């Protein structure tokens, strides 16, 4: 997480950074980064946005780390199709991006929230920083729909924080510039 903080400073990023997540695993991976950036309020205004893809689990996990979402989107409904979930998250995030000044978006992993956060940020011409980038199965149906979500997120990400050299190689193979990929391990 300290390496990610230093890369953000190196890239001239200051102030309004939105972390978008909705699941317990995303929070577990992003909490160390959030907590590190919160130590530097003169450099970063950390905005925590929870789509509540896993409402109870995500809120419990935030509390475990002593964190609270600044924005809760409550995007899930019973028996939603993937298209309905995506439409609800995209629409909700678009409203957030229209109402707030955001300098960068950080997402983690390969969920619907990650893809929607990346797309919304891209539509608003705000850089996307993808944590756990470069994981690949090369089978769009395994895992489904996550493989497509992580590949699409990579297409719009400005920086890719890959866990391993294997993940970096996967991104290089897809034409991502080497200077946009940073092997940081797992958070």
Describe each model-derived feature in a short phrase:
Residues 9-52:
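N-terminal subdomain of nucleotide-sugar transferases
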Residues 16, 103-104:
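Structural motif
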Residues 44-85, 92:
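Conserved nucleotide-sugar phosphate-binding/catalytic loop shared by glycosyltransferases and other
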Residues 96-103:
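Glycine-rich phosphate-binding loop signature in dinucleotide/nucleotide-binding domains
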Residues 106-124:
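An aromatic- and histidine-rich active-site surface loop
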Residues 126-187:
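Active-site-proximal region of nucleotide-activated glycan assembly enzymes
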């Amino acid at each position: 997480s300290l390496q990610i903080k230093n890369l953000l400073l190196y890239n001239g990023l200051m102030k309004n950074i939105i972390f978008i997540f909705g699941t317990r695993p995303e929070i577990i991976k992003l909490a160390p980064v959030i907590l590190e950036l919160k130590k530097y309020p003169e450099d970063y205004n950390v905005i925590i946005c929870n789509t509540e893809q896993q409402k109870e689990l995500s809120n419990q996990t935030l509390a475990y780390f002593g964190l609270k979402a600044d924005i809760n989107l409550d995007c899930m409904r019973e028996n939603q199709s993937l298209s309905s979930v995506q439409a609800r998250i995209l629409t909700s995030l678009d409203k957030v991006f229209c109402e707030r000044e955001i300098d960068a978006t950080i997402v983690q992993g390969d969920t619907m929230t990650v893809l929607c956060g990346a797309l919304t940020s891209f539509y608003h011409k705000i850089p996307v920083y993808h944590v756990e980038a470069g994981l690949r199965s090369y089978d769009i149906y395994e895992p489904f729909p996550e493989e497509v979500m992580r590949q699409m997120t990579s297409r719009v990400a400005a920086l890719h924080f890959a866990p391993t050299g294997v993940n970096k190689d996967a991104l290089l193979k897809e034409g991502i510039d080497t200077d946009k990929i940073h092997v940081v391990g797992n958070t």
